[in-house]
Amino acid sequence: MVALVQRVSEAAVEIDGAPVGAIEHGLLILLGVHEDDTRTESAWCAEKCARLRVFPDADGKMDESLLDTGGDALVVPQFTLYGDTSVGNRPSFTEAAPPDRADRLYEHFVRELEGHLGQDVPTGEFGAMMDVRLTNDGPVTLWVERRADE
């Protein structure tokens, strides 16, 4: 499982021009599910995202997490994170989990993250074409990955 995590001052997702989720200060998490992922990887990634110390403390040092700041998270599914561009010019998505499994693990990730944060987490919609807007803060962007064989 991979989470592309971006510290944002605001982020929002729309489907067909209608807003479906938005946050202010927090993390935008683009989530990709690998074909070998299980609930173990999902739970690990959710906890890691909740505990990532990427927000500045009183001294300006990146040392606080969403749990410390009370910030929000917005989670958007993105199977293209598993796009393989090593051969040719058209990405292959064979490493991405099939949609039914990916959707279940995506929902599991969201529930786990909500449990850690103690609040509802707005999300994009699995399988939908979405417009995502964000204002990076920093910018701070991290690649958080956990493979089933680790």
Swiss-Prot record:
Similarity comment: family membership: Belongs to the DTD family.
Domain observations: A Gly-cisPro motif from one monomer fits into the active site of the other monomer to allow specific chiral rejection of L-amino acids.
Catalytic activity: glycyl-tRNA(Ala) + H2O = tRNA(Ala) + glycine + H(+); a D-aminoacyl-tRNA + H2O = a tRNA + a D-alpha-amino acid + H(+)
Signal peptide range in chain numbering: none
EC number(s) on file: 3.1.1.96
Source organism of the structure: Salinibacter ruber (strain DSM 13855 / M31)
Cell compartment(s), UniProt: Cytoplasm
Protein name: D-aminoacyl-tRNA deacylase
Annotated motif Gly-cisPro motif, important for rejection of L-amino acids, positions: 138-139
Oligomeric form and interacting partners: Homodimer.
BP-aspect Gene Ontology terms: D-amino acid catabolic process
Main location as per UniProt: cytoplasm
Function noted in UniProt: An aminoacyl-tRNA editing enzyme that deacylates mischarged D-aminoacyl-tRNAs. Also deacylates mischarged glycyl-tRNA(Ala), protecting cells against glycine mischarging by AlaRS. Acts via tRNA-based rather than protein-based catalysis; rejects L-amino acids rather than detecting D-amino acids in the active site. By recycling D-aminoacyl-tRNA to D-amino acids and free tRNA molecules, this enzyme counteracts the toxicity associated with the formation of D-aminoacyl-tRNA entities in vivo and helps enforce protein L-homochirality.
